[in-house]
Amino acid sequence: MSFFHGVTVTNVDIGARTIALPASSVIGLCDVFTPGAQASAKPNVPVLLTSKKDAAAAFGIGSSIYLACEAIYNRAQAVIVAVGVEAAETPEAQASAVIGGVSAAGERTGLQALLDGKSRFNAQPRLLVAPGHSAQQAVATAMDGLAEKLRAIAILDGPNSTDEAAVAYAKNFGSKRLFMVDPGVQVWDSATNAARKAPASAYAAGLFAWTDAEYGFWSSPSNKEIKGITGTSRPVEFLDGDETCRANLLNNANIATIIRDDGYRLWGNRTLSSDSKWAFVTRVRTMDLVMDAILAGHKWAVDRGITKTYVKDVTEGLRAFMRDLKNQGAVINFEVYADPDLNSASQLAQGKVYWNIRFTDVPPAENPNFRVEVTDQWLTEVLDVA
């Protein structure tokens, strides 16, 4: 029946949708603890942590994984998805436990259990650490693969012995997903009244999270102070303007290090990528977050009818999202458009629509140059008299 006497209200479901950025600094952590009465966590089962108190209750004060959480929370109020594994009898067995896999019961173990972070807690790790264990190539390689799946950065520990050993270790990799820190740090231990050595990766992860909160995910954690340490495992020479100092030699090998300069600072912007396009960790992270935001923000657009309104709504939503990023300072500029060449009649008939999103990210000022000249140009001004 087409006749109706009265008011009709119809929902017109058109218009651009907002696109939200995902959390940039959820930390995925895997380390050792001892199950028992002092620890509520179970081996290989992810736990969501938001404070030292949570970490102590889950893993027990003094466990390796608790100390890693403490290192993170010394700098940032971070969300951590933590997976504890039991101590093994040999280094090889310990590496296998940390790497993890899938058990006979179909449960993920070790680092692989971090993949369950999103389904369990709606928290997808973006920064991965396995403090100390990542100094083993097998563990680092596993972290690289996991980081690729999660669109994350794996923060590796170096061998923590010599600069030469660190450079040699870095040459084993060529991935944009890996960010390596060497040497480790020294931390005061109140239980023993002495300094102890600790891996640097957890401290770097905390600094990444703090930088995200203070400056934005597009900012580098380099040249920012690490809290809670009393020194480094070995001295790292840093002299302003000296290309041959040890800190610069490590950076030249794409290794971040820790320098003492108005406090202890992380020093280095680069991933271990063999592709110069992805040298800066800031570019990798910006691309990851933009891509994931676009993916998550367009579930509504799947299976809608391909009309002019549909193409307009998606395009306007993308432009609004990128405009917001530009206004925040996350990107310099951008362009968004439906691709006229790819969107042929045959492609549209198959339900495929293509948009191009191009943007320029914000690189870190790794090497400001100041050209200073002394000149006699104004010397005769001393003769000027009023």
Swiss-Prot record:
Keyword field contains Zinc? no
The cross-references to Pfam families, in alphabetical order and at most eight, read: Gp18_domIII_N, Phage_sheath_1, Phage_sheath_1C
Family matches, as InterPro entries? Gp18_domIII_N (IPR054564), Phage_sheath_subtilisin (IPR035089), Phage_Tail_Sheath_Structural (IPR052042), Tail_sheath_C (IPR020287)
Q: Does the keyword Manganese apply?
A: no
Q: Where in the cell is it found?
A: Secreted
Taking the first listed entry, what is the main subcellular location of this protein, grouped into a coarse class? secreted
Locate the transmembrane regions by residue number. Answer: none
Q: Which GO terms describe its cellular component?
A: extracellular region
Q: Which UniProt keywords apply?
A: Secreted
Q: What else is known?
A: The gene for this protein is encoded in a region with many other potential prophage genes.
Q: Which family does it belong to?
A: Belongs to the myoviridae tail sheath protein family.
Q: What is this protein called?
A: Putative prophage major tail sheath protein
Species this protein is from: Pseudomonas aeruginosa (strain UCBPP-PA14)
